[in-house]
Amino acid sequence: MKSKEILGYDIKEISNQTVEQLIEKKKELQGKLNDLQQELLKRKVEARMGTLKNTASIRNLRKDIARILTLLSIINKEIENKKKESKK
């Protein structure tokens, strides 16, 4: 069975990484998230001004933002689990 991927990140791969690797991925994803949020704001302004030609791009950006937030949630849970395991 093929494992699930979100934005090129394999979910099973995430659970096999160390805490340091997960923190690095988290920082990378937060940077992408900020970039996408700024781009979304820019596109919304363009849409209001009537200069946006591809209105579907707003929907696509919102979906990408949701995917990144999902990944961040998974990574945060995995970091918590690994920290709990290391304390035992």
From Swiss-Prot:
One GO term describing the cellular component = ribonucleoprotein complex
- Please give one Pfam family short name: Ribosomal_L29
Keywords, comma-separated and alphabetical: Ribonucleoprotein, Ribosomal protein
- Some GO term, biological process aspect, for this entry: which one? translation
Q: Can you name this protein?
A: Large ribosomal subunit protein uL29
The family note in this entry says: Belongs to the universal ribosomal protein uL29 family.
> Any idea which GO molecular function terms this record carries?
structural constituent of ribosome
The organism's superkingdom is given as Archaea
Fetch the SUPFAM superfamilies from UniProt.
Ribosomal protein L29 (L29p)
